[in-house]
């Protein structure tokens, strides 16, 4: 459908004319390199040019080159950042704004598998299509800086960063350049340190030294519990697993399995990752999400003895130890099998449970059988599903541990809600004061001992056994039932003092110590896929890992015919990963000289996770063609280095969805901090300001089967919705079926996606840009309605007519001077639009532009609007509708483009009202309104208020006792 008028105006702003204008200016910008931002040094520098002090690095989150292309929701953030970038160019800033593609990873690989073509082929085709679609929108990107993570020249440096992290260790005592303790140092320095401090270092074998050094590295191999998905044939990160324990991609079952995997020691940076959030201009919601994910908590590590084995638990409330009546270990805890073997008289845990509550046995005859059955039952549960723990389940191990504060023998269980990666993988359960522990204790008939009482309760309330407790008391209160004969007395104390005393006692007895703990776990950094960055690691005949020297980079991903992952029966939890690269035998086995002669080595057949390429891409945007360094530090310092009031440095504006609030941003911050510690960059944070854009949503429709039907074929009638289409068996005959409306995401699978190509064809790219920016605040979600797009088109048509004669296509303005009313309207618009653009409130900027265009249209007939009123309009319009603004600017006689034209300035005197309206109250009730001069005296205001007819009638016959004048606000008359 085309929304053009049928009037025969050759230069009317129709979709056809818009298309010609947009193609013209997009070619002009590309030919001239209009948006190229110069660097201080290197191949992107402009010799002899003096760079502006004001520079802005504006970055969008990496898009994934999807095979289905874009819908109108995808460009929302890209248009928003383009408006911001164009505005700052007009303010004189050197603006770096570009866009690359995050092209490795499971989505691209699975799409390639589905279509039967190589992932590189489909990925490059998808990128080309996305570039075409985005190109139509007139985004002002410096295309010299664009790349894909799949480019060999790019992932060479991803591999280089991996090696820097691999060849580093974290020294908690070293002061970093930011002045705080803890930093990454080269592993060579650790080797020198150990050689100087350890008398036996010289006597150790090379393998022994290597093993010690490897235990310190920031990248290490570990036997860890991972999410194994047989149906996909790969290990998944936690974020790739749904709450139901299935893969986000493909919806296959996921099982917990112990495998040797590459891990990154992100936990070493826990404190800095939390503390440095204070330097950043991020939404508080995102900061809170990161703090919660890292989960720093202060408490104590306490040791419970169990048959000569130490069970260590971390607790934030050591003051409640007297209420610990049982213990729970993660089913995967390293002590479980040992403790089971020590239960009863057997060496295997096969002795039958004796005098044990049947609820504790999981329906099995002995602890060994119960543990085996329980582990099998929970194998498919995700961490999230386990922590939700809706149904309380567990197994008694047949052993008891000793509570260190009172000597009580407490039963030891395993339960799925305790995870190995959190804390120590074991907890002390205080059911009287923890809801989850209370539910477990109630389910299993365990004792509940209150050790905290509500304020004002009797000291003896809630004797041991807690019979009167119907739920956990989770608030704070004075301690009860909390003393022993060995010097620990907590009764009557508040929380803080009791915690301190408990830790002091534990430390004095050697059964505990104060400690800071974190929920954050090290980063699982390997995938059993083909489409990813190969590891720059080889193994010798003994299986020892060796990082490759830099001159052997990049390790290129081999071109193979069989790139599909080795998948298994989705329910085969006993299967093991077989990475696709293992099939490339000639690539895997190599002869290399790593310093001690040529030897046979074997490449690592895993690939890096998709997060790798997006963890540092902002740095490569700065210096994309540098063959000698990841980034020249002079260029890095210019664009993202520390500035006054911004010691962290970082990208000026980073825009993307809140779904990346934790993982991507956490990983990027971690990598950046390591690079900072190693002197590669001058900034210690990658992104100074973060902005989360909202989403464009849409209505979708389902039939009686719950199947989605095409939204464009649905009509509404009498509050109901009907799918109207041609019947399958009769040409020309329509079939109608009632369907049901739902509101939410836009997407191809929901059959409600609207292509930006369609809107550009029917209305023009500038109309799409204006509509999306006008729909609502950029950081909130909003509903798409194609029928409303025409409003944005009509606004641009009115603006066009103010400057252009629709019959001749020539400029059509007058040289008349502006009236006072014109000046007020103009300067208020300039001030408001300037403020709105600067604060990313583009919807209100568009509203002000519409209001100003309406004012000029009503005030002046065609061709009569003053140039001095129209040209500032075109300048203000340029960031949001750049093509039409460029064309209008040229038609008005300017030979230079508008991109770098200065944004208009306002005069404060035109922002002040000559007169103001004040409400007048009599005895607190509104009785009238008066208009007075803005600078009217108090006496004049009082006189005007008393003369207002309705006010006068309400005080007639009364004595005015007082007149209260609140300047600029109101008048209140007290009359009796």
UniProtKB/Swiss-Prot annotation:
Subcellular location: Cytoplasm
InterPro entries: Leu-tRNA-ligase (IPR002302), Leu_tRNA-synth_edit (IPR025709), M/V/L/I-tRNA-synth_anticd-bd (IPR013155), Methionyl/Leucyl_tRNA_Synth (IPR015413), Rossmann-like_a/b/a_fold (IPR014729), tRNAsynth_Ia_anticodon-bd (IPR009080), Val/Leu/Ile-tRNA-synth_edit (IPR009008)
Coiled coil: none
BP term (GO), one: leucyl-tRNA aminoacylation
CDD domains per UniProt: Anticodon_Ia_Leu_BEm
Keywords associated with the record: Aminoacyl-tRNA synthetase, ATP-binding, Cytoplasm, Ligase, Nucleotide-binding, Protein biosynthesis
UniProt keyword annotation of Transferase present: no
GO MF entries: aminoacyl-tRNA deacylase activity; ATP binding; leucine-tRNA ligase activity
Residues the record lists as binding ATP: 748
The protein's enzyme class: ligase
Pfam name, any one: Anticodon_1
A cellular component term, taken from the record's GO annotations: cytosol
Motif range ('KMSKS' region): 745-749
EC assignment: 6.1.1.4
Short sequence motif named 'HIGH' region, residue ranges: 63-74
Catalytic activity: tRNA(Leu) + L-leucine + ATP = L-leucyl-tRNA(Leu) + AMP + diphosphate
PANTHER family found in the cross-reference section: LEUCINE--TRNA LIGASE, MITOCHONDRIAL (PTHR43740:SF2), LEUCYL-TRNA SYNTHETASE (PTHR43740)
Family the entry assigns: Belongs to the class-I aminoacyl-tRNA synthetase family.
Protein's name in the database: Leucine--tRNA ligase
Gene symbol of the encoding locus: leuS
